[in-house]
């Protein structure tokens, strides 16, 4: 009976999240506390330790209610998560940075606590959603940080709207073009970060459990994701799994468009603000991140070692180092 009541309570909470405007403390929106499984000094032991955390929402011009996580005061710092990711995974990053900034993490459409809809599954629409978030917040100038696909969303934003309003930008381990053109040289492929020559096979492998190998997709992020060799990462993933119910069919809608975009022209010609790029030696994306740092004027590359958790999930596995490095860049 207790299990039934718990499930019913959670279902009602999730229903309220999906159907109402959100503007409340995270504890109130989620309907319960959460205890992180592994104690980590300097990070919250329970959700209730993060008293400043709120979950809010706004509605886009095409009628989609998007959630965003917010904490802290000061200069705005806006995070855009990667494919299928959400603000809950940023719990430790937000906790550390909200002591210095107004930190905002957007749940993109079909991800996290945002609406699941059958339309708008394109990076260009995600970039418009980001623009509409800033308009909703009344933010005229902010620092932006995109991880994985979130970096592509910011590149799309820059392509559409330019860099006005972007004070500084941070990109974390996103290939410049996941799709590898068949007429590329090997050097061009490495510089762009291409990992597949078949977007269809890659999407099927990632979303439907289709056959996968290193010729259809980069297997390393999946291998590194399964490692729970960081207590902070284990905690943030446990929290996200407990409070966010991801629908694979919904998150899959943007993936084909994401895979086939080639951002080399935007990265090499349209970025004119200070940029930090994060990657590491446990990521196959490092060569493309070096290329990006070489073509963006004044860009700084942070390449983490294996001991520093330098893989696709570095910001979650080593949040103390990441937030320290990011703060140093933002305050330069």
Label every PLM stretch briefly.
Residues 2-6, 22-77, 99-101, 139, ...:
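Alpha/beta-hydrolase fold catalytic core
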Residues 61, 69, 105-149, 160, ...:
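Active-site loop/oxyanion-hole signature of alpha/beta-hydrolase fold enzymes
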Residues 61-116:
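Conserved HGGG/HGGXW glycine-rich cap/lid loop of the alpha/beta-hydrolase fold
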Residues 84, 108-112, 151, 176, ...:
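Alpha/beta-hydrolase active-site loop signature
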Residues 155, 166-208:
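Flexible "cap/lid" loop of the alpha/beta hydrolase fold
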Residues 245-294:
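Conserved serine/cysteine hydrolase catalytic core
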Residues 299-332:
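Catalytic active-site module of serine/aspartate enzymes centered on a nucleophile-bearing elbow/loop
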């Amino acid at each position: 009976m207790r299990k039934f009541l718990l499930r019913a309570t959670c279902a009602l909470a999730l229903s309220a999240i999906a159907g109402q405007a959100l503007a409340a403390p995270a504890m109130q929106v989620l309907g319960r506390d959460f205890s992180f499984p592994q104690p980590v000094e300097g990070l919250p032991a329970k959700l209730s330790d993060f008293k400043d955390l709120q979950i809010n929402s706004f509605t886009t011009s095409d009628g989609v209610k998007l959630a965003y996580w917010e904490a802290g005061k000061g200069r705005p710092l806006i995070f855009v998560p990667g494919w299928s990711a959400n603000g809950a995974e940023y719990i430790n990053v937000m906790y550390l940075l909200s002591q210095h900034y107004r930190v905002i993490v957007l749940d993109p459409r079909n991800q996290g606590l945002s609406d699941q809809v059958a339309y708008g599954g394109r990076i260009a629409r995600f970039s418009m959603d980001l623009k509409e978030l800033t308009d909703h917040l009344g933010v005229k100038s902010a620092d932006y940080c995109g991880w994985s696909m979130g970096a592509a969303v910011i590149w799309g934003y820059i392509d559409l709207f330019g860099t006005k309003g972007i004070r500084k930008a941070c990109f974390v381990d996103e290939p410049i073009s996941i799709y590898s053109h068949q007429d590329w040289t090997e050097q061009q492929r490495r510089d762009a970060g291409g990992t597949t020559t078949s977007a269809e096979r890659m999407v099927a492998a990632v979303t439907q459990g289709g056959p996968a190998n290193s010729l259809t997709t980069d297997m390393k992020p999946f291998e590194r994701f399964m490692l729970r060799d960081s207590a902070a990462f284990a905690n943030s993933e446990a929290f996200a799994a407990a409070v966010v119910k991801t629908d694979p069919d919904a998150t899959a809608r943007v993936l084909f468009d994401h895979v086939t975009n080639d951002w080399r022209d935007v990265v090499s010609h349209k970025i004119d603000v200070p940029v930090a790029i994060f990657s590491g030696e446990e990521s196959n994306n490092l060569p493309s991140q070096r290329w990006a740092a070489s073509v963006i004027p004044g860009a700084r590359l942070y390449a983490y070692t294996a001991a520093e958790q330098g893989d696709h999930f570095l910001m979650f596995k080593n949040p103390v180092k990441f937030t320290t490095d990011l703060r140093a860049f933002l305050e330069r």
